[in-house]
Swiss-Prot record:
The gene is cobT. The active site is at 318 (proton acceptor). Coiled coil: none annotated. The keyword Glycosyltransferase applies. Belongs to the CobT family. Catalyzes the synthesis of alpha-ribazole-5'-phosphate from nicotinate mononucleotide (NAMN) and 5,6-dimethylbenzimidazole (DMB). GO terms for molecular function: nicotinate-nucleotide-dimethylbenzimidazole phosphoribosyltransferase activity. This is Nicotinate-nucleotide--dimethylbenzimidazole phosphoribosyltransferase. It comes from the Bacteria. Signal peptide: none annotated. The lineage of its organism: Bacteria, Pseudomonadati, Pseudomonadota, Gammaproteobacteria, Enterobacterales. The keyword Cell cycle does not apply. Homodimer.
């Protein structure tokens, strides 16, 4: 059986030769050079991913939603009852939540994964990878053991790779868990080195008079657990949560297949920071969807070196932003594969990247 280290070592490098070929192809399409902006850059990025074999395309699409409760909820860092995690997970099986509606619109399947919901029995219709009934309270103990974190990472990586074998070429990540912006902020603060006050936000509408307590909880969690910012697994195990571990696993699994994965919002940025500490080679496979409205979003994205494609003032989570951005990936593939070529129309354009083809 493969270990986590074995799987991390399988992540392929981006193919620069394929990207160069894609650049030449795109420059020869029926348009001024560079006139489709970031859509062109996205198509070139996709062409370099070995899992797509040099041709940007989208097969099956999947959004994987990692669901878990958090012991830190007991610290008063969220206003929603903890039971909402289980209720919303059930609603996802009915297709009635935000991510389900947006994923259906994008033609993507939603995989709802229980990695740590606090219920006596598993919830019917969910993929059961439950490690425990919620993580530990990071304000007074580690979220989980390193062994638990590594096993869950491995399980999710293997599940993601199996989906890729069955034709999924575009992944999105999402999460569900009351109070989970608190461990996410702890991860972002730890890895970026920024003070908790700079990255802690209101999450799901936390009243501003409770924000100081949330900042204090994050600071206490980091001080108590002393996560090593250079060790992504250590950070996740000490101040993270099962949902954050699960998202990191999807990213690592998709990258190990040479396939793109769309990030969602703030929670996914935190998971991506930890995943990149485990394997910097995954970064070219991470595609940002939207700019989360959560306070620490820009700090996390800047550290990752990523610029989102959308700014919709969204902070729902669930994978909603990832689902919303899937048509952008498909648009990049469409221009690459379906546009005509300048040479075929006997058009010669000067090397002016700002000119309009019709001017």
């Amino acid at each position: 059986m493969q270990t986590l280290a074995d799987l991390l070592n399988t992540i392929p490098a981006i193919d620069p030769a394929a990207m160069s070929r894609a650049q030449r192809h795109i420059d020869g399409l029926l348009k001024p050079v560079g006139s489709l902006g970031r859509l062109e850059a996205l198509a070139i990025q996709l062409a370099g991913m070995p899992g797509l074999n040099g041709i940007p395309h989208v097969g099956k699409k999947a959004v994987l939603v990692m669901c878990a409760d958090h012991g830190v909820w007991e610290e008063g860092v969220a206003i929603s009852p903890k039971e909402v995690t289980a209720i919303q997970a059930e609603n996802m099986t009915r297709g009635t939540t935000g991510v389900c509606v947006l994923a259906a619109q994008a033609g993507a399947n939603v995989h709802v994964v229980d990695v740590g919901i606090d219920t006596a029995e598993p919830i019917p219709g969910l993929i059961n990878m439950r490690v425990a009934r919620g993580s530990g309270n990071i304000a007074s103990a580690p979220a989980m053991s390193r062994r638990q974190a590594e096993k869950l990472l491995l399980d999710v990586i293997c599940y993601t790779r199996e989906l890729a074998k069955n034709g999924v070429t575009l992944f999105g990540v999402g999460e569900l868990g009351m109070a989970n912006t608190t461990p996410a902020a702890a991860i972002v603060s730890t890895i970026t080195g920024r003070d908790p006050e700079e990255v802690v936000g209101i999450g799901a509408n936390l009243p501003t008079d409770k924000l100081a307590n949330k900042i204090d909880v994050v600071r206490r969690a980091i001080t108590l657990n002393q996560p090593n910012p250079q060790d992504g697994v250590d950070v996740l195990a000490k101040v993270g949560g099962f949902d954050l571990v699960g998202m990191a696993g999807v990213m690592l699994g998709a990258a190990s297949c040479g396939l793109p994965v769309l990030l969602d919002g703030f929670l996914s940025y935190a998971a991506a920071l930890a995943a990149c500490q485990m394997s910097p080679a995954i970064k070219p496979y991470l595609t940002p969807s939207h700019l989360s409205a959560e306070k620490g979003a820009r700090i996390a994205l800047s550290h990752l070196g990523l610029e989102p494609y959308l700014d919709m003032e969204m902070r729902l989570g669930e994978g909603s932003g990832a689902a919303l951005a899937m048509p952008i990936i498909e648009a990049a593939c469409a221009i690459y594969n379906n546009m005509g070529e300048l040479a075929a129309s006997n058009i010669v354009l000067p090397g002016n990247t700002t000119s309009d083809l019709n001017s």
